[in-house]
Amino acid sequence: MKENDILQAQDVRFRYDTEQPNFAVDGVSMEVHRGEFVAVLGANGCGKSTLAKHFNAILLPESGTVLVEDMDTRTDEKLYDIRQKVGMVFQNPDNQIVATVVEEDVAFALENLGVPTGEMRTRVDDAMKLAGIYEQRNKAPHKLSGGQKQRVAIAGVIAMRPDCLILDEATAMLDP
């Protein structure tokens, strides 16, 4: 792994059912450098989301290696550090929203990380403003549009201030 690499995949292979011959990800190798913007394009069902879930160890490769700043995603002791460094916004925001009020949802991960209250308030407000959801901060997420829910999910990850942000079609549901 090069000094400025934040993510590296080497010959990653993954299949959801090891009894089946077809791989969802088959031999992918790539590097993402710090500060770089990368888009992975492909047809529906080609493995883009599956690959993305490898970068914060939601999925682990059947073979090959995924490194986050030289930390192997298969190393249990590094899982916490990896997930702090790589934030992910899922394609469907309902899979990510856990609280009953928008600002509580944005603060959820920060509470789990033990971020001090004053800093948490600043991060939550800044993230909600950046994601364009600040005006909805006291609303229930289930009463928001799909695009607004996506903004809540984006704000929650931004508030964590990860070194790398993975967006799995995160703008697909956004309102104009």
Language-model regions: role of each:
Residues 165-168:
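Catalytic Walker B motif of ABC-type/P-loop ATPase nucleotide-binding domains
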Residues 56:
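Helix-to-loop junction immediately C-terminal to a conserved catalytic motif
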Residues 140-144, 148:
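Conserved ABC ATPase signature
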Residues 64-74, 82:
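Conserved ABC transporter NBD signature motif
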Residues 118-136:
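Conserved ABC ATPase "signature" region
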